């Protein structure tokens, strides 16, 4: 009865060594794919509002999901509005209307005023 080779024991189920994202089979390193997030912007706003407060990575992940969700909702609503009015371009007007439709009361008013302020600042800096 032949004995199994002792140089490499059989790996347990599911414990196969996977090639990492940063390596190829021939050993050359590959550029890591960038993971885009809003974390630096969330952090900047946090420091403006509460300079002495930090944020955990879990909370940052939640904030990132929140920003992505709101972005998708506003973009979807603005797209629908442009389609209803037979327009092929989403302008600041569609975004503003989408914000008014999606956000409740006072929150919508503040969002619209901050958005208008940001657009004015951007156009004046050009």
Swiss-Prot record:
Coiled coil (residue ranges): none
Sorted UniProt keywords: Acetylation, ADP-ribosylation, Chromosome, DNA-binding, Glycoprotein, Hydroxylation, Isopeptide bond, Methylation, Nucleosome core, Nucleus, Phosphoprotein, Ubl conjugation
GO CC annotation, single: nucleosome
Listed transmembrane segments: none
Residues where N6,N6-dimethyllysine is found: 58
Domain of life: Eukaryota
PANTHER family cross-referenced by the UniProt entry: HISTONE H2B
The protein's name: Histone H2B type 1-B
């Amino acid at each position: 009865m032949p004995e199994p080779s002792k140089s490499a024991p059989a790996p347990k189920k599911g414990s196969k060594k996977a090639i990492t994202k940063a390596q190829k089979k021939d050993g050359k390193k590959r550029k890591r794919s960038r993971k885009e997030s809003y974390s630096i912007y969330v952090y900047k706003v946090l420091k403006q509002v509460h300079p002495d407060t930090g944020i955990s990575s879990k909370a940052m992940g939640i904030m990132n999901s929140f920003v992505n969700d709101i972005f998708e909702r506003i973009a979807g609503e603005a797209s629908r509005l442009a389609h209803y009015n037979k327009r092929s371009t989403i302008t600041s007007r569609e975004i503003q209307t989408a914000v008014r439709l999606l956000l409740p009361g006072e929150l919508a008013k503040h969002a619209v005023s901050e958005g208008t302020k940001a657009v004015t600042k951007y156009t004046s800096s050009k």
